[in-house]
From Swiss-Prot:
Transfers 2'-(5-triphosphoribosyl)-3'-dephosphocoenzyme-A to the apo-[acyl-carrier-protein] of the malonate decarboxylase to yield holo-[acyl-carrier-protein]. The keyword ATP-binding does not apply. The gene is mdcG. Its EC number is 2.7.7.66. The keyword Ribonucleoprotein does not apply. This is Phosphoribosyl-dephospho-CoA transferase. Pfam families: MdcG (PF10620), MdcG_N (PF20866). Keywords: Nucleotidyltransferase, Transferase. The active site is at D134, D136. It catalyses: apo-[malonate decarboxylase ACP] + 2'-(5''-triphospho-alpha-D-ribosyl)-3'-dephospho-CoA = holo-[malonate decarboxylase ACP] + diphosphate. It is an enzyme of class 2 (transferase).
Length: 205
């Protein structure tokens, strides 16, 4: 893989042994290389890619690392909101997928995608969705976005047939859109921890 993986991307590895520094015993029993891991936010002095492993139970999440050379496939959140992908998903009748389809009917001035359990289900066709599942949304924003357009997005998201939350990804981290619109500031999750900021598109030393 030549492109640098970004947080929330799903990546497949060339071998189970490519997953490094995993302590949780359930991973060896449940995870195999045919299943993707999700890129998370962290830093490593060995230039490895930080990833998370999803288990069968909701509480089963494990953090690990992989060498970029061992990644053989990558699916981004944006790839999962192609309308044809959504319409042909085996989970098309589930409320989170219906919600994603509804959002594709509008042309947004930014790239966006689906993460979380809905993204995992769309990418793998593994039935981890149910009627009460949330829809986790991601907006990629390298530059500040128009507030009125974001308010329109929030209005449409509030009308979806499921609970939905949006994170906005900036060059310096990610923040909850509803928090930022409501308070004028938000907790920015960065690779080195979280910080409260009103300017998530600006680096703070």
């Amino acid at each position: 893989m030549s492109a640098t993986p970004r947080p929330h991307d799903l990546v497949w590895l060339n071998h189970a042994s490519a997953l490094e520094d995993i302590a949780e015993p359930w991973v060896a029993q449940q995870w195999r290389a045919a299943l993707p891991v999700v890129v998370r936010r962290d830093v490593d002095d060995q230039a490895r890619v930080p990833v998370g492993v999803r288990g069968m139970k909701r509480e089963q999440r494990a953090a690990g690392w992989v060498q970029a050379r061992n990644i053989v496939r990558s699916v981004t959140p944006e790839m999962l909101v192609d309308r044809e992908v959504l319409l042909h998903s085996p989970f098309v009748s589930q409320p989170p997928v219906q919600g994603a389809i509804a959002l594709t009917l509008h042309r947004w001035p930014w790239g966006w995608g689906v993460t979380g359990s809905t993204g995992y289900a769309l990418a793998t066709e593994i039935p981890v969705l149910h009627a009460a599942s949330d829809l986790d949304l991601l907006i990629r924003a390298s530059q500040p976005l128009d507030r009125e357009a974001l308010l329109e997005w929030q209005t449409r998201v509030a009308q979806l047939p499921c609970r939905a939350d949006t994170q906005v990804e900036t060059p310096y981290g990610a923040f909850a859109l509803n928090e930022w619109l409501r308070d004028g500031r938000a907790l920015l999750k960065t690779s080195r921890g979280a910080r409260l900021t009103a300017t998530p598109w600006h680096r703070e030393e």
